[in-house]
């Protein structure tokens, strides 16, 4: 009887030795749980409001140990008496993922703004200077909110969460594993 228990336990443990999070799962988590709207400046003088409209995550593609977050954003910009301008911005952030064992959450650290364009074209310097603080706040927000969280109600995720796992990037997935 005890041998049967050990066999079943080892099969379960072997199946739970790691948990992978795909790019799509992380993208879906961000869409469902995180929203970004930032504004800077003084309205009717120099003002910008930036809202993220779409996010996509790429894991370990451009840099083996980093996660890239692509954000399509809309920026409404007003400079002095000129009419408001609407800009469709493409942002790319990259960051190192970090797993918090206490909460079962994945956070992004060492965030870098890699790309900052409007439809693939660099922005004029005056507009870039005005919008950059709001864009930086989006990057800051990405570092403060989890980009993925293990679900305590799913057995495999609960078992991984209760241990002290490592986080690695493998095959364009975040892999939370119990053993090196």
Language-model features and meaning:
Residues 4-14:
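Bacterial N-terminal signal peptides
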């Amino acid at each position: 009887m005890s041998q049967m228990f050990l066999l079943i336990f080892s099969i379960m443990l072997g199946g739970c030795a790691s948990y992978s999070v795909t790019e799509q799962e992380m993208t879906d988590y961000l869409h469902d749980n995180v929203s970004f709207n930032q504004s800077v400046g003084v309205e009717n003088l120099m003002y910008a409001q930036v809202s993220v409209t779409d996010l996509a995550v790429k894991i370990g593609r451009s840099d083996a140990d980093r996660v890239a977050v692509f954000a399509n954003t809309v920026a409404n910009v007003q400079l002095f008496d000129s009419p408001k301008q609407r800009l469709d911005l493409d942002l790319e952030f990259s960051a190192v993922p970090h797993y918090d064992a206490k909460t079962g959450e994945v956070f992004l650290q060492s965030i870098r703004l890699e790309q900052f364009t409007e439809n693939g074209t660099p922005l004029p310097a005056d507009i870039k200077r005005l919008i950059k603080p709001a864009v930086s706040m989006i990057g800051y927000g990405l570092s403060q909110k989890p980009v993925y969280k293990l679900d305590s109600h799913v057995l495999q995720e609960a078992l991984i969460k209760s241990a002290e796992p490592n986080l690695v990037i493998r095959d364009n997935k975040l892999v939370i594993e119990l053993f090196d």
